[in-house]
Amino acid sequence: MKNKLLFMMLTILGAPGIAAAAGYDLANSEYNFAVNELSKSSFNQAAIIGQAGTNNSAQLRQGGSKLLAVVAQEGSSNRAKIDQTGDYNLAYIDQAGSANDASISQGAYGNTAMIIQKGSGNKANITQYGTQKTAIVVQRQSQMAIRVTQR
């Protein structure tokens, strides 16, 4: 019941500026690419990108407060980038296999950033400006690298 209520709240709050991209590119099922920029209605936005296939890539840009950005990728060449400006934002990237790469950039205060990578090329970068910020990075082996900058 609690999960259902949370889902409904996120759906209602994110409705004015929600966008989602998932699955395969219509032109070629082996290349995934998604770019999402939300800049109107500057609060309570939710952007969710989920990809599965081969040459993954995703890019998000949000401006405002109380924003949610989620990118989840599965196999192959992965990449992801999230850029949020404003306060009380949450950015989440989860990648699974292959060349991985990830980046999150947040400005203002009260922001939370999470990157979870599971295998292969790994790299991660979180840059946060402002106060009251949280950064979480979990890498479960392969070549790994990490840079977290909080100012």
UniProtKB/Swiss-Prot annotation:
It is found in: Fimbrium. GO terms for molecular function: identical protein binding. Residues 1-21 form the signal peptide. It comes from the Bacteria. Disruption phenotype: When disrupted in a cellulose-synthesizing strain (with a functional bcsQ gene), cellulose is made but colony morphology indicates no curli are made. GO terms for biological process: amyloid fibril formation; cell adhesion; curli assembly; regulation of amyloid fibril formation; single-species biofilm formation. Induction: Under control of the CsgD transcription factor, part of the csgBAC/ymdA operon. This is Minor curlin subunit. The keyword Transcription regulation does not apply. Keywords: Fimbrium, Signal. Disulfide bonds: none annotated. Belongs to the CsgA/CsgB family. Curlin is the structural subunit of the curli fimbriae. Curli are coiled surface structures that assemble preferentially at growth temperatures below 37 degrees Celsius. Curli can bind to fibronectin. The minor subunit is the nucleation component of curlin monomers. Coexpression of cellulose and thin aggregative fimbriae (curli fimbrae or fibers) leads to a hydrophobic network with tightly packed cells embedded in a highly inert matrix that confers cohesion, elasticity and tissue-like properties to colonies. It comes from Escherichia coli (strain K12). GO terms for cellular component: cell outer membrane; pilus. The keyword Chaperone does not apply. Cellulose production is abolished in E.coli K12 / MG1655 and W3110 due to a premature stop codon in bcsQ.
